[in-house]
């Protein structure tokens, strides 16, 4: 993992972070292990945790978090790569003849595929179970990796939360930025997300990347067309389109 200080010179970014929580430099952080890059207001703390998927698989996860005054920022990475093994093993203990014991298509032994396909929607639903008012929900992409973004008002104190959920190389990315009532919207954090290839270089795809089993993986921009047999079996550069503040 590496970090460097990056001046925020873009006028749009300055408008997003100006006010009580503004500083001249943020930390540009990258994780080769989790294959992402983004900016934080300070070097993030890193902690390990676990995530229970929609179908009950307990998956390893890592949280990167930082604070700036009363504003809080976090990025959680959930590794869905073990999900096939975990859910297949889970199916072995089901009563004989039940649906979850059948290895037919995407049912039974194949439930892990639906767990991966629905991971973004499931993570999004967890935000909506909080005491919040959702003011905006939109499809989005970062460097042509598809995902979803949310804007929420927290009912308890009227603080604002901007969240984003993406999935790349079977790693679920959950970003969350919360600023107090009256502060500028914390949109710059979720829109700074980028991807890294196996060598740690910035990555942008030539067509839309969809992290799902049986879906062909597109070639990186500038690379040769992908082999049609190269699919995201096993579970699965800035340029995202930010939504309006609602």
Language model region names:
Residues 1-9:
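Bacterial N-terminal signal peptides that target proteins for export
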Residues 21-23:
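Boundary at the C-terminal end of the N-terminal hydrophobic targeting segment
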Residues 30-32, 39-41, 47, 67, ...:
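A structural detector for beta-sheet-dominated domains
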Residues 32, 36, 44-45, 96-100, ...:
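Surface-exposed amphipathic alpha-helical segments
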Residues 37-45, 50-57:
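Non-catalytic extracellular/lumenal accessory regions of secreted precursors
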Residues 39-43, 67-70, 145, 166-173:
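Short, solvent-exposed coil/turn segments at beta-strand boundaries
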Residues 50-160, 233, 240-246:
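Conserved polar/disulfide-associated segments of primarily extracytoplasmic proteins
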